Regions:
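N-terminal secretory signal peptides that target proteins for export/translocation
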Residues: 1-11
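Bacterial N-terminal signal peptides
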Residues: 13-25
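Residue-identity detector for glycine
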Residues: 19-21, 536, 657
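Short linear Ser/Thr-Pro motifs
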Residues: 22-24, 206-208, 616
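Sec/Tat signal peptide C-region and signal peptidase I cleavage site
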Residues: 26-30
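C-terminal PAP-associated
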Residues: 31-536
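Long beta-sheet-rich domains in secretory-pathway and surface-associated proteins
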Residues: 538-658
């Protein structure tokens, strides 16, 4: 395809970064030093307006085509007890307060636009006046004020009409649509290939905020491997993408690979390059996602894009991708931090036959996709702090639950796990999540829900910024309840869904996912809905109201406290000692098990005793390699029946460190 590597960044440069202290040896353990490459698009042009193009069909494909893609990632996770399950100890006191959907309408139905395939890979994005939904090989544009269709459904090949090559003739699916609100442009992508595997990425950037208008189109050849599961993100200096890479036969996982596309050039319709490692990062590296910018407040000036890895080793591996499209040799992809993640149990690590449904046999259980972070990884800068929110699926209480999280300080540090929790309030299986945060700091989570007694449903849950951390305290609502279950189709579901935030008011969430209207095979439908968690100033959480009784007796409870509030250690490390106290109320007399999260790499915690009914000494042994910084960590206590979870925070300061 006549693509040109224009520069290479050597392993020696990576070693220099280590020697200069830009990276510590402990933080870089996950990466094998590799050169980077700059590769030019092999073709670019300007399309005709989409509204003038025919809704071109692609040749019908075998129904197992998409089901054969998206190989599972080898499981390297060691299961540990999940201490973060929120089964509703707080929620049971609160009336569900999530509002009903504002708009709620059907999207593209099976068979899409010429693609007899499953799953649909449903995703969508909201812009200034429109909502664009994509499924495998199809797109549709809606009026966001009414939900009425403006254009489509149309084949994605219509977008590439006249471009030539595999982008026009051999799209493989895995589409993604984003809205670049900094430029008021749409970004649409899918992968393609001349043979049986995807080897190219096709990216189109609109020339205006009208998704039915013209597009700057680009074809990029990535290599000869099997490049799978592309997910894009918007950042001020580039469009960033993650890929899961396999050998050409799809039988061996070679690791993830990050890509950065020249946003400035693509907005202008000029020839563009991407910068990437010359090869995937290795089969021992879990998949990752790039941070996707929400809101109009930019990241700190010059901040790198953040990639976050799936915490298969109970650590959130945070990478920084610095790119320089003018001098590509200045670009680096490095590990920034590896904060601890709460323990969890993998969901169905060796099989796709996992999530039960009503009315079908066990052979038709659905794929839970518990081996990666789910789309999107949403970044927002609030001025006084940065937030990065996401989710993945775990096994909790014998069903699928959703581990959601918020990291802070992801570009400049100090990086902390501000909150994380497993949402599993009952015996329903919840998976296929997508998380985002609005401009008020309210967090929403959209997902699929199913069990042996219900057909798959589309639901959402949320929390206000003022709610207790680690809880989705606003409860749960139903966007749409399917009336059927899926049989056959290789157990596939998803492979992803999409929750986005309206750029005009920064408070309205838009969510899209799939469902089935009847129990059958290859008959999916998609749904699109919008909702809010708050407007203006976030609404305070409702005050718990106990059930009236003739002689009310407060329930046993406790709180946690820690002293001192801050301890410092010097450049050589040492021990930081705190006292954690269980403060019982109303006759609480149970043992409380303590855990800690948010500590920097190189820090080992020990509680003595643990569990405790009174006090426990927390000793943090800080290694000399721990980076200089101020780290806010969270101590969590779990005790009582039913389990009561309480938290407290303190600070560890490493001075004159590396």
């Amino acid at each position: 395809m006549n693509y040109k590597p224009t520069s290479a960044l050597t392993a020696a440069r990576f070693a220099t970064l280590l020697g200069c202290g830009v990276l510590s040896a402990s933080s870089a353990f996950a990466l094998t030093p590799q050169p980077l490459q700059a590769t030019a698009s092999y073709h670019n042009d300007l399309s005709r307006p989409l509204r003038e193009m025919a809704a071109a069909d692609t040749p019908s494909r075998r129904q197992d085509r998409e089901a054969a893609e998206n190989p599972k990632i080898p499981n390297s996770h060691v299961d540990t007890p999940d201490q973060l399950v929120d089964r509703g100890s707080l929620l049971r006191f609160l009336a569900p307060s999530l509002p009903a959907p504002i708009l709620n309408f059907d999207g593209i139905p099976f068979p899409g636009v010429g693609c007899n395939c499953a799953p649909p890979d449903t995703n969508g994005e909201v812009g200034a006046t429109q909502y664009v939904q994509m499924v495998n090989e199809g797109y549709q544009v809606f009026d966001k004020a009414t939900g009425n269709s403006i254009l489509g459904p149309s084949s994605i090949t219509s977008l590439w009409s006249g471009f030539g090559g595999v982008c026009q003739t051999s799209g493989f699916g895995d589409p993604v649509v984003l809205y670049d609100q900094l430029a008021n442009r749409w970004v649409i992508s899918q992968f393609a290939g001349a043979g049986s595997i995807p080897t190219d990425e096709c990216v189109a950037v609109s020339t205006s905020s009208d998704a039915t208008g013209t597009y700057n189109r680009y074809g990029f050849h990535l290599g000869t491997n099997f490049f799978d599961y592309p997910h894009l993100a918007v950042w001020p200096d580039g469009y960033y993408m993650s890929m899961n890479v396999f050998n050409s036969s799809g039988t061996a996982y070679l690791g993830p690979q990050p890509f950065a596309f020249d946003r400035t050039a693509m907005l202008a319709g000029a020839p563009a390059i991407f910068i990437s490692p010359v090869a995937p990062l290795g089969g021992s590296i879990p998949p990752f996602l790039p941070a996707d910018l929400d809101g109009s407040t930019l990241p700190p000036s010059g901040a790198p894009n953040t990639f976050l890895g799936f915490p298969s080793s109970n650590k959130y591996t945070v990478y920084h991708f610095h790119v320089d499209f003018t001098v590509p040799g200045n670009s680096t992809f490095t590990t920034f931090a590896t904060p601890a993640a709460g323990g969890f149990t993998s969901l169905c690590p060796t099989t796709r036959s996992c999530v039960p449904q009503l009315g079908v046999t066990s052979s038709s259980k659905l794929d839970g996709i518990g081996d990666r972070l789910m789309f999107r990884l949403a970044y927002r800068n609030f001025g006084d702090h940065e937030s990065l929110v996401g989710n993945f699926t775990v096994s909790a209480g014998g069903v699928a639950g959703i581990r959601w999280f918020e990291l802070r300080g992801v570009t400049a540090g100090p990086l902390t796990v501000f909150q994380e929790s497993t949402y599993q309030p009952d015996t329903t299986w919840r998976w296929m999540g997508s998380a985002a945060m609005d401009g008020q700091g309210n967090l929403a989570l959209g997902f699929s829900a199913s069990s042996g007694s219900i057909h798959p449903q589309i639901r959402y849950a949320g929390r206000l910024a003022t709610d207790p951390i680690n809880t989705l305290a606003q409860g749960e609502a139903h966007l749409f309840d399917g009336a059927g279950s899926q049989s056959a189709t290789g157990n596939r579901w998803g492979d992803y869904s999409s929750l986005t935030v309206d750029p005009t008011d920064d408070t309205t969430f838009w969510y899209t996912n799939e469902y089935y209207p009847t129990t059958t095979t290859f008959n999916w439908r998609t749904r699109i809905g919008s909702f809010k968690l708050g407007t203006g100033t976030p609404t305070p959480t409702p005050t718990p109201t106990p059930t009236p009784t003739p002689t009310p007796t407060p329930a046993p409870d406790y709180s946690l406290s820690i002293s001192p509030s801050s301890v410092s250690v010097g450049r050589n490390g040492g021990s930081a000692v705190y006292t954690v106290t269980v403060n019982p109320t109303n006759g609480f007399s149970s043992l409380v098990t303590l855990s800690v999260a948010g500590l920097p790499a190189g820090t080992t915690p020990v509680f003595s005793p643990n569990p405790t009914m009174a006090t426990s000494t927390l000793t943090l042994t800080v290694d000399s390699s721990t980076r200089k910084g101020t780290y806010v960590f969270t101590v969590t206590g779990m005790g009582g029946s039913p389990t009561i979870t309480r938290t407290t925070t303190a600070t560890l300061v490493k001075t004159n460190g590396r």
